[in-house]
């Protein structure tokens, strides 16, 4: 197993909090499943900030940023029953990774954290 990419991003939570006042920002950046889940969450600022950082870190891990026809909504962050975060790997993401790295079998690993003013995400892309 080989590490193909690493991405990290830090977000100032207040910046995302201000952006949340713009409905177009939410619709442009977050998937419908993330928006639905956010409605059940008390601390929306933290929820959205951590996911924004995760999406940025993801784009850095694959080495393209938001190019190659990749946009924020293509990346959905989910949590398992214990709260461990991960990504929904869509066919579009598989295609981008396959084209960029010439592989078809891979894993993403995601770690997210926040502390008062900041949220941070760390992503590793690994060949299986």
Curated annotation (Swiss-Prot):
Q: Which UniProt key words apply to this protein?
A: Cytoplasm, Fatty acid biosynthesis, Fatty acid metabolism, Lipid biosynthesis, Lipid metabolism, Magnesium, Metal-binding, Transferase
Cross-referenced InterPro entries: 4-PPantetheinyl_Trfase_dom, 4-PPantetheinyl_Trfase_dom_sf, ACPS, Ppantetheine-prot_Trfase_dom
Reaction(s) the record says it catalyses: apo-[ACP] + CoA = holo-[ACP] + adenosine 3',5'-bisphosphate + H(+)
Q: Where in the cell is it found?
A: Cytoplasm
An annotated Gene Ontology molecular function: holo-[acyl-carrier-protein] synthase activity
Name the protein family: Belongs to the P-Pant transferase superfamily. AcpS family.
HAMAP family registered for this protein in UniProt: AcpS
Q: Give the protein's recorded name.
A: Holo-[acyl-carrier-protein] synthase
Q: Which organism is it from?
A: Pelagibacter ubique (strain HTCC1062)
Underlying gene = acpS
């Amino acid at each position: 197993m080989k590490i193909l990419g690493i991405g990290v991003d830090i977000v100032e939570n207040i910046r995302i909090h201000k952006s949340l006042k713009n409905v177009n920002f939410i619709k442009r950046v977050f998937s419908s499943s993330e928006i639905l889940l956010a409605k059940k969450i008390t601390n929306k600022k933290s929820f959205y900030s951590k996911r924004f950082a995760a999406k940025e870190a993801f784009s850095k891990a694959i080495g393209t940023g938001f190019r190659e026809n990749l946009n924020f909504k293509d990346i959905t962050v989910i949590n398992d029953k214990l709260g461990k975060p991960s990504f929904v790997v869509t066919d579009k993401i598989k295609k981008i990774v396959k084209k960029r790295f010439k592989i078809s079998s891979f894993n993403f690993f995601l770690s997210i954290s926040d502390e008062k003013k900041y949220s941070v995400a760390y992503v590793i892309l690994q060949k299986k």
